[in-house]
Curated annotation (Swiss-Prot):
Domain Peptidase M12A: 123-320
Organism: Haemonchus contortus (Barber pole worm)
Cofactor dependence: Zn(2+)
Example GO BP: proteolysis
PANTHER family xref list: DISCOIDIN, CUB, EGF, LAMININ , AND ZINC METALLOPROTEASE DOMAIN CONTAINING (PTHR10127), ZINC METALLOPROTEINASE NAS-36 (PTHR10127:SF849)
EGF-like domain span: 320-355
Record text on cofactor binding: Binds 1 zinc ion per subunit.
Pfam family, one: TSP_1
Name under which the protein is recorded: Zinc metalloproteinase nas-36
Length: 612
């Protein structure tokens, strides 16, 4: 039986790899032997990590089951294409043969035995040969498979990298094949190599990969950046929930010591290079990464744009010799490597020395506020009605002399609800204003008060996709000690992965995951258990409904009903029927609102347990 399962996995991987191999050979300077080596090393790495996590459980069976499920590293990034996945590390990295072997050696402990004192703190490739030269532009060209819309967005992403770093790129359609260059092509998904590897080096911008932050992410790989959560210090900021990872993908959550260099920069949970909270999830909703500080949970996985520390990573790696003299920039800013008399400022800050607020976008809002002992309030555009509009941004800088600043959310609170916030309010109250702050969205108002570490803080409002109510926040000067008031983190205890004799012996169920929705009945949560024997009957994972309280009344409902009154015809009648109940607390189908609680007797719920 084991032989048949392994044979199935081999045949499936072979069929997928035939298509994937042709794509990789066409757009990268790699041959059959290199591809075979990379594929073999990644398979060994997967088996090694699987054995460490699950003991003697059959890898082949898990790999077969996992191959049927979609995989993504962030909800804001497309799923990994199965044809190329056997050759990709961490979902979107095509390793060189040397890189793959080095990672396997490090993870298996071979290097640590021969070099026990070697250790680093890393997020940028440490190999000197992996850096592109700064004496000439990085050449690139577009393959004919790239459509005009993708070309336009790639050019915008390249220009943004150029605007904030010392790097220069040059479109060279006639670049010689023996030169080093990047080739953008429409492949199966979004992926890239790490750093400069020589010759033609592809960056796949596949279908649904054209969002600015996704393209910037893949270019980041091409110029030397690894994923943020691969740093050896990542466990101080995140916890990996192995119970909820697709078992054959646990190797994609390894922390490594020797491949890359952090250049002394702090960990950034808002990096565009960070996994999302449901990366490689068994059900695309259970969280595989839990932030140690739960206030950052909705920050990780963003694909809006480069974070300030993403930019500083490249500037430290490539541009540290561009500006001499002292750094007069304030609040974590530093001289722009192309204009040394200008400061690059952390998100939300601006001005000659980074002491002012960043100008607003498509709204009249923001400002620099001198905090007093009495409460002062700010609010998002249009709060609470008609609410904010898409693609707006506001920035406030709060300052006080000799005291700290206390913040508290008041009145109403509502944003587009996503696991990684797309529309959000962000709070930066730490002593270091460079890293991304806490980001909140959805419908639950943050409870309690928050106190800054120093006498300055930054609040950022950002909308990208929708209109909604937004937020209102009040602030005052205080002598209270710095604090946040996060809800406790629910840490899942991973069952011991020891394989024992016999059959059908399960470990205890793990803890329930967080609910995927805050109200309305359509949220789910799940938990898993580990088979202690080689085979077990029954379900490895079970699901439960959760948060059955009806959602609040939509603040835009009255506006929609008013618009509907001027509409006539059959289409408008259907719209009127759909809107007729929007002045009542809402439940998701198949639930109905019964005295404020969402209830249903639908057979669809037969597969769901009731969590206790």
């Amino acid at each position: 039986m084991l032989l048949l399962v392994l044979l199935f996995v081999f045949i499936s991987a072979t069929n997928a790899s035939d298509v994937g191999r042709r794509e990789l050979e066409k757009h990268f300077d790699v041959g059959d032997s290199s591809l075979d080596s990379v594929g073999d090393v990644l398979l060994k790495l997967k088996k090694l990590a699987h054995q460490r996590a699950f003991g003697n459980r059959e890898f082949g069976h898990d790999a077969e089951e996992d191959s049927k499920k979609p995989v993504a590293i962030s909800v804001l990034q497309p799923t990994v294409a199965k044809d190329v996945s056997p050759y990709l590390f961490e979902g979107d990295i095509f390793l060189s043969k040397k890189q793959a072997i080095n990672i396997l050696k490090e993870v298996s402990g071979i290097e640590s035995k021969s070099k026990p004192n070697v250790r680093g703190r890393r997020s940028f490739d440490a190999s000197p040969e992996s850096k592109w030269p700064t004496t000439a532009p990085i050449k690139y060209r577009f393959h004919e498979s790239i459509d005009f819309y993708a070309v336009s967005n790639i050019i915008k992403a390249i220009r943004y990298w150029e605007n904030v770093t010392c790097l220069e790129f040059e479109n060279s359609p006639d670049v010689a094949d023996n030169e080093d260059f990047i080739e953008f092509f429409q492949g199966q998904g979004c992926y890239s190599m790490i750093g400069r590897n020589g010759g033609r080096q592809g960056v796949s911008i596949g279908e649904n990969c054209v969002k600015a932050g996704v393209i910037e992410h893949e270019i980041g790989h091409a110029i030397g950046m690894w994923h943020e959560q691969s740093r050896p210090d990542a466990q101080s900021y995140i916890k990996v929930e192995s119970d909820f990872i697709l078992p054959s993908y646990v190797s994609d959550f390894l922390q490594r010591d020797k491949d890359i260099d952090t250049l002394g920069l702090p960990y950034d949970l808002g990096s565009v290079m960070h996994y999302g909270s449901t990366a490689f999830s068994v059900d695309q909703s259970s969280k595989t990464l839990i932030t140690r500080d739960p206030l950052y949970q909705s920050t990780i996985g963003q694909r809006e744009t480069l974070s300030f520390l993403d930019i500083e990573t490249i500037n430290k790696a490539y541009c540290s010799d561009r500006c001499s003299g002292s750094n007069d920039c304030k609040n974590g800013g530093y001289p722009h490597p192309k204009q040394c008399d200008t400061c690059l400022c952390p998100n939300g800050l601006s001005g000659p020395k980074c002491e002012d607020f960043e100008p607003p976008r498509k709204a009249e809002c923001g400002g620099k506020i001198v905090v007093k002992e009495e409460w002062q309030s700010i609010e998002s555009p249009g709060f609470p009605d008609p609410g904010y509009d898409p693609d707006q941004k506001c920035n406030w800088v709060f300052e006080v002399a000799g005291k700290r600043i206390e913040f508290e959310f008041i009145e109403e609170f509502s944003f587009l609800c996503t696991s990684t916030c797309v529309d959000y309010v962000e709070m930066k109250i730490s002593a270091d204003l460079r890293p991304t702050g806490f980001r909140w969205c959805c419908f639950n108002i943050p409870k309690g008060s928050f106190v800054s570490e120093l006498n300055i803080a930054v609040i950022i409002f950002r909308s990208q996709l929708t209109n909604d109510v937004g937020f209102k926040l009040q602030a005052r000067a205080t002598d209270l000690p710095a604090r946040t008031t996060p809800a406790p983190v629910v840490i899942t205890t991973t069952p011991v992965p020891t394989t024992i004799e016999g059959t059908d012996q399960w470990a205890e169920w793990g803890s329930w995951s967080q609910c995927s929705r805050s109200c309305g009945g359509c949220g789910i949560m799940s938990r898993v258990r580990v088979c202690r024997t080689k085979q077990c009957k029954g379900r490895r994972q079970e699901f439960s409904t959760c948060n059955l309280k009806a959602c609040p009344i939509d603040k835009h409902c009255a506006k929609l009903l008013a618009n509907d009154k001027i509409c006539n015809g059959r289409v408008c009648t259907k719209a009127s029927q759909a809107l007729s109940g929007c002045l009542e607390p809402q439940c998701c189908p198949p639930f109905i609102n019964v005295d404020g609680t969402c209830q249903s007797d639908s057979p669809l719920l037969n597969d769901f347990e009731l969590a206790k």
